[in-house]
UniProtKB/Swiss-Prot annotation:
The keyword DNA-binding applies. It holds the Pfam family MSSS. NCBIfam families: mutS2. Residues 715-790 form the Smr domain. This is Endonuclease MutS2. It comes from the Bacteria. Homodimer. Binds to stalled ribosomes, contacting rRNA. One of its GO terms (molecular function) is ATP binding. InterPro entries: DNA_mismatch_repair_MutS_C (IPR000432), DNA_mismatch_repair_MutS_core (IPR007696), DNA_mismatch_repair_MutS_sf (IPR036187), MSSS (IPR046893), MutS (IPR045076), MutS2 (IPR005747), P-loop_NTPase (IPR027417), Smr_dom (IPR002625). CDD domains: ABC_MutS2 (cd03280).
Amino acid sequence: MEESSLEILEFDKIIDRVQEFAATIIGKEIISRLQPVDNLNYVKNKLREVSSAREILEEYGRPPFGGIRDLREIIEKADKGIVLSVKEVMDVRSTLEGVRELKKYSREIGTGIDDELQDIYSIITEKFDRLTPLKQLENEINRCIDEHGEIKDSASRKLRSIRREMDRIEGKINDKLNSIINNTRYQEMLQDKLVTIRGNRYVVPVKSSYKNTFSGIVHDQSTSGLTYFMEPMAIVKLNNRLGELKRAEEQEIYRILKKLSENIKEHTRDLSDNLEMVSLLDVDFARARFSIEIEGIEPGINDKGFINIRGGRHPLLKVKPVPIDITVGNEFKTLVITGPNTGGKTVALKTVGLFVLMVQAGLHIPAEEETVISIFNGVYADIGDEQSIEQNLSTFSSHINRIKRFLGKADARSLVLLDEIGVGTDPREGAALGVAILEHLRERGVTTIATTHYSEIKSYAYSQDGVENASVEFDMETLQPTYRLLMGIPGGSNAFEIALKLGLPHDIIKDGKELMSGDDIKVENIISDLNEERKKYEQLKIEIEERLEAVKKKEQKYDSLLTDLEKRKKKLITEAREEALQIIKKTRKESKEILRRLKNKEFASRSDIDRVENEINLNLKETEKEISEKRQNKDGRTRVKEISCGDQVRLKKTGQKGEVISVDREKGEAVIQAGIMKVTTGLDEVAKIDIPDDTKDELFHSYQVKKKSRVSPTLDLRGERYETAQHKLDKYLDDVFLAGLKQVEIIHGKGTGALRKAVHTVLEKNPHITSYRLGRQEEGGSGVTIADLKS
């Protein structure tokens, strides 16, 4: 790419913005070197990396890049066998910890997601997978160096021994010094009762008048000359020994650092690979964070010269820009943009050029999803005099010099951007030269976008195949540009209309129009007609879109109704067949189960069993009759009488009879006590029956009387599992209800409270229970629940 064009389009400012989001030194360096690339596959991969990193960012937050250090010089030193400093070893440890944290972060990515998202994430997670934690090396460094950069005593036995001896010697020195400074014999000689160090030797401050009297060696003198810092002779040998130990300590620390450096040398390849991969990940996530900031998207890309920007917004403008739509490179390769000054022509030109550069550098752009950008081998921009987009300074000579350079390089895979082509000289000559330049570029197949004020260039764009007009819209009511870009419509000068609205006399405006050439008038009339047609078209488009939306909604409504009808039809047919085949089979199976359970109950007499068996046979006949009735019913439904608590009903599917315990009209459900079983069913699945009062509950009460003496008022669930306890409690409540007990005691123990919760969950839902509470202290406290049953 041409350097001057990158500067004109302010690509460097984009790079600076992206760089701010990088967390590592190497990542920032890589971003600073980003350049547009004209390889289609490379660009595709880079854009996908940004999209993948952005998905991860928005779902899992920012990766922990903290702690990563620039180890390039350290690795180079280690490879050469140079002993590393403590700080350098700590930088290695910090980076190892950072890599480990990044691996931990990556393990959370993509758990429990669909394959499509997994594929998106994998573009980045594959890089995380290539990171190699060096836990053994990290542990060894941690064993030797603490968080403050001090070599630990545990780094070696010898170091521990040396430091113990140093502590012992220092203790002796302190004892002797304390005895000296606290001795009345020396107090007159000492300037102060303190101990200090000079030249790694312990000394005391002696008055200058006593320097020859005090027994010791002078190591330093105060600035005033009144104090001499002297090492008492009593500790000279101890200080000498301490010095020897400190030198031994330094030698041992050097040996430890040398060994650590050798360990690091063994892993320099892994360290380099990790550093490279972390830096690349840092760049990916920096570009992703930039994408989020500018509300960017991954555009479609091609290498055919086709650009189709939808809702494009220049990323460097401080004020929120008006989104632009702009197309070039498909049906036409040259686009001419016209319109008023400060109307947005130059911004549109720069937006296109900068978008191309950003995409080719692997960056998202602030636009709508439908946007398509082409890859070019060269972008050549002549916009102003290499000024910022807020300025519009140029000279004819600077324009021509740049255009001459472009013409020598541009080909069918190039993008040329020309701002105010032909400006800076005689308008007629400038316009003619502008047309000639555009025609030359068109013939060479160069994708070109140019801005102009010249009517001749507008006419050229209107009449020449492969060239299209566009304009920035101007609001004649407010006399302000709207900054909207209108494709296919050239922009008028609007000079006469603006002058008229501003109050210039009509006769002056009339004279001005008469002075215009015939061609100019023709062009302005064409532009005026086109703008009128555009307004009609836009209004018609709005009406058509509204009608299409209304039709679409109706189609959706009718499709939904048709689908529902088809489903209902199939469902009714299926239900009818299934009921005919299954209902009797199910009824017989349930009836046999009831009989089996009755026979297994000690309280059930032979007459009870016979009575139930006769009732089941009767119900089977009624069920067969019901199936026949259902077949004759068109929608498979029957009207039911209003069901209330206490009503006697028959279950349509099984034929069983029972009593309604509770009714939930919102859900359309009822709980039925059918013999020894309770059943929850839909209100439309039961039929109300009339039974004489004297026989209504005969069978039920016969069970109740005989079972009452067999059921205990206490249930002990301690040691049971959650689900088993709930199942046992459910069955127990049925039994005690049939037995007619009014209150029961459920023992669940205190423990963790899980079993108590299970018991209370069952009691809350059971229709037989009126209330429940934890036991009083004398009843067992919170380890027991007392439940009251309905009468």
